[in-house]
C-alpha cells in the first residue's frame, strides 16, 4: 500500500478551527518517508485560511514526528514541527513563521 492518511481537527489561535489531512508516504524502511497535505482554518464567518504543505515524517516509538513547510493563503510560510501521540490520540504542533 505504501501510504496512510491522517486527519485532524483543532484550535490554532490565529488560524481558528483548523481541519487538516496528512498523506504519509512510506520510505523503504516503513518507519518514515514524505508527507504532504492541506488544511483549512475558520476564524469566523468572514475569515478563512487555506494552506498546503510538504515535508518528512518518521516514527519515534508510538509517535509520528513530522516537519513540514506550509504555504498559507495569506502569503505566510511556516515551518511546522508536529508530534502525533498515537497512544494518547492527540497531536501537538509548534509553528515557526519563516516568511
Language-model regions: role of each:
Residues 1-99:
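Beta-strand-enriched cores of mature, soluble protein domains
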